[in-house]
Amino acid sequence: MEKTLTIDGKMIKFKCTGGTLMRYRNQFNSEFLADFSALGAAQKDPAKLNFASIENMIWAFAKTADPTIPDPQTWYDSFDEIDIFEVWGELSELVSKAVKTLTKNAGRAANQAAN
């Protein structure tokens, strides 16, 4: 699953694969699916919104599409303007499909391990 967006006049590719979860965990020492689930809960209570998780997920999708992207701080500093919520909104379909696929695969793996 891939998507290209224009951010600050630059074409940026975003991609989600099975490796995205590992990349996210290794970079941020946090579980992607748990953080994504917490974002869903924040819809009911915006005070619980973890803005850093959104930034981290966006970076992980970009890094998956382009391994040459630098660390998150350097990458975000490369933009004069970036609307995180606009980017997140544009990536919502990619994120939804990815999470559906990942949770489906995780469920299958758990069932196979139990048998």
Where are these regions (language model features)?
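Charged interaction scaffolds used for protein-protein
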Residues: 1-11, 30-52, 64-115
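Short capping micro-motif at the N-terminus of alpha-helices
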Residues: 14-16
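N-terminal first-folded block
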Residues: 18-28
